[in-house]
Amino acid sequence: MAIDGVKIIDSDQGYDIYNEVVGRYRDGDHVSNIIKDILDAEKDYCQTDFFTEIYWTALAYSLWKIGHLTDDIRDKTVELIQKGADPFWMEIDPKALKQRQKVLEKLAVQLQTENPRPLKVPKAKANTQ
């Protein structure tokens, strides 16, 4: 898995989760189905504490982005953030742990607020034929 930076979706896994949530939401899939499917795949994503951090932060961020962050996912993510960035970030880059922690702290604050401009589901165009 590629890690391109310390931001929430700067990894293949984070990007995959974000794209699945946003893509399915824009395609009109019901949010509860999206959440269920991603939570059902938790064991596949969360092989280590490092990947668990990426999984929960990407999921919470994605749901916040579409305006459908649930309290339980928010609370679990904030609890994980309070534990601090996983030490594996140091193996990626000596400065990454501190940088990631700043990103996580910013996300924790963001998750406590409602998204003022959530992504909208595009309206289906009427077929004129």
Stretches with model-predicted labels:
Residues 1-40:
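Short terminal alpha-helical segments
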Residues 2, 16-18, 51-64, 94-104:
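Amphipathic alpha-helical elements of HEAT/ARM-like alpha-solenoid repeat scaffolds that form extended
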Residues 27-32, 74-77, 81:
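Short amphipathic alpha-helical heptad-repeat segments
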Residues 6-13, 23-27, 69, 73, ...:
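Non-membrane alpha-helical secondary structure
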Residues 77-129:
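Amphipathic alpha-helical binding modules
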Residues 25-29, 42-45, 66, 84-88, ...:
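Short, flexible helical or helix-coil boundary motifs
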Residues 3-6, 15, 22, 42, ...:
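Generic intrinsically disordered, low-complexity segments enriched for polar/acidic and small residues
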Residues 29-71:
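Amphipathic alpha-helical interaction modules
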